[in-house]
């Protein structure tokens, strides 16, 4: 697969995919916007603390690889970035809205169960039921130009198998073992995280609006 990303590159692309859908009025993103999105404490696993210089290096590299492109509007001296990772005019990777939501959530959070993915991806796409989540994951796992996700072996004591994206290469399942219980408490945690993400984005929108009114 030609999509061989580092963990930081996956975070940058995941953030741009997320913000393109959830906060379209702030998209494309400036370097500062990408830094803020990458270092979010909600809906991110692991939480990162990237510097602007480190993010700029990742952006420059991704532009060279044609996964991103720069956008400069008339009269706007700030360079902004938009993703060309999928669904771009000349790109090869075409994903449905449901597939984009799942891929984005996997890029931002790593291996997750279908239940966790349904809850955490809900701001990008509203799945009708668990069957739709699972069928979308299976399509991503069986695509001729893929596979793009893999179903991991179910861990002892867990009800659901987790899925992981393959955009960073082969998966070492042992390194993905977690102590998070796949139970009602895990579902509750997912719902709390989704609410925290919504609050964080509303605060970001309010700050942006107040800054605009103060200009």
Swiss-Prot record:
Q: What SUPFAM superfamilies does UniProt report for this protein, alphabetically?
A: Winged helix' DNA-binding domain
Q: Which cysteines are joined by disulfide bonds?
A: none
Which top-level group of life is the source organism from? Bacteria
The record's InterPro entries line, in alphabetical order, gives: DUF480 (IPR007432), WH-like_DNA-bd_sf (IPR036388), WH_DNA-bd_sf (IPR036390)
Q: Name one Pfam family in it.
A: DUF480
Q: Which family does it belong to?
A: Belongs to the UPF0502 family.
What is the name attached to this protein's record? UPF0502 protein YceH
Q: What is the lineage of its organism?
A: Bacteria, Pseudomonadati, Pseudomonadota, Gammaproteobacteria, Enterobacterales
Gene behind this chain?
yceH
């Amino acid at each position: 697969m030609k999509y061989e990303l580092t963990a930081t590159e996956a975070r940058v692309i995941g953030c741009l995919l997320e913000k393109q859908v959830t906060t379209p009025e702030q998209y494309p993103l400036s370097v500062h916007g990408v830094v803020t999105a990458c270092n979010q404490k909600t809906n991110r696993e692991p939480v990162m603390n990237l510097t602007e210089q480190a993010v700029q290096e990742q952006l420059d590299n991704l532009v060279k690889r044609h996964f991103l492109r720069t956008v400069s509007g008339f009269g706007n001296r700030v360079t902004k970035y938009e993703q060309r990772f999928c669904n771009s005019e000349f790109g090869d990777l075409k994903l449905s809205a449901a597939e984009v939501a799942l891929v984005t959530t996997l890029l931002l959070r790593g291996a997750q169960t279908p239940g966790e993915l349904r809850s955490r991806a809900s701001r990008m796409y509203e799945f009708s039921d668990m069957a739709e989540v699972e069928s979308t994951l299976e399509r991503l796992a069986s695509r001729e130009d893929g596979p793009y996700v893999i179903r991991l072996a179910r861990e002892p004591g867990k009800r659901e198998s987790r899925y992981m994206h393959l955009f960073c290469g082969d998966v070492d399942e042992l390194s993905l073992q977690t102590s998070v219980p796949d139970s009602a408490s895990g579902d509750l945690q997912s719902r709390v995280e989704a609410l925290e993400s919504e609050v964080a984005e509303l605060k970001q929108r309010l700050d942006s609006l107040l800054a605009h009114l103060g200009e």
